[in-house]
């Protein structure tokens, strides 16, 4: 980023060589995950969010992951959230990713999302016996 503008290379389309059918299939599955799966917490009124959770096993607490993009048919933002020792993907990854997308797309958080953000600012994660 220079002078508040993204490098033009980020606007260039890249082609993977994968048949479009598989892309559409994956997007539909990611949308369903937000509507009725593990990503339900990423639902943002008026925005079609697509996402996928992940959980990485760890000796201690599992790591929480979420990847998503929005809006579905004309993406403006893609996020990847990875919270060490955050538990399942829907524990930290999904809600934090949803807050980031809502703020970016709408330019602000709704009252309920602002309240959720406030809760997350005060949550602590235990790292190997140390709370951070």
Please provide the spans of the model-predicted regions.
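Active-site beta-strand/loop architecture of penicillin-binding DD-peptidases
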Residues: 1-17, 21-111
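Short, highly charged C-terminal tails/helix-capping segments
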Residues: 111-132
């Amino acid at each position: 980023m220079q002078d508040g503008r993204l490098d033009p290379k980020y606007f260039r389309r890249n082609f993977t060589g994968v048949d479009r059918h598989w892309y559409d299939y994956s997007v539909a599955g990611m949308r369903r995950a937000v509507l009725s799966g593990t990503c339900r917490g990423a639902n943002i009124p008026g925005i079609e969010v697509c996402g996928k959770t992940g959980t990485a096993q760890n000796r201690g607490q599992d790591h929480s992951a979420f990847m998503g993009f929005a809006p579905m048919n004309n993406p403006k933002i893609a996020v990847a959230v990875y919270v060490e020792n955050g538990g399942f993907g829907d524990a930290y990854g999904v809600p934090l990713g949803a807050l980031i997308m809502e703020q970016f797309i709408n330019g602000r958080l709704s009252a309920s999302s602002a309240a959720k953000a406030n809760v997350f600012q005060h949550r602590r994660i235990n790292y190997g016996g140390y709370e951070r």
